[in-house]
From Swiss-Prot:
Site (Basic residue of the functional dyad): 19
A Pfam family per the record: Toxin_25
UniProt name for this protein: Potassium channel toxin kappa-KTx 1.3
Known role: Shows very weak blocking activity on voltage-gated potassium channels Kv10.1/KCNH1/EAG1 (6.2% inhibition by 40 uM of the toxin). Has no effect on the other voltage-gated potassium channels tested.
Effect of residue 20 to R: Does not block any channel subtype tested
Site positions (Aromatic residue of the functional dyad): 5
PTM per Swiss-Prot/TrEMBL: Is not amidated.
Native source species: Heterometrus spinifer (Asia giant forest scorpion)
Compartment annotation: Secreted
Disulphide connectivity of cysteines: 4-22, 8-18
Any further remark recorded for this protein: Negative results: has no effect on Kv1.1/KCNA1, Kv1.2/KCNA2 and Kv1.3/KCNA3 potassium channels, suggesting that the presence of an additional charged residue in a position adjacent to the dyad lysine impedes the functional block of Kv1 channels produced by this toxin.
GO molecular function list: potassium channel regulator activity; toxin activity
Length: 23
């Protein structure tokens, strides 16, 4: 979900990583 993506991004990960992690 979006919350996961936002947390991932704020933690300093890149877009592709967050898409995978939060899919």
């Amino acid at each position: 979900g979006f919350g996961c993506y936002r947390s991932c991004w704020k933690a300093g990960h890149d877009e592709e990583t967050c898409k995978k992690e939060c899919s």
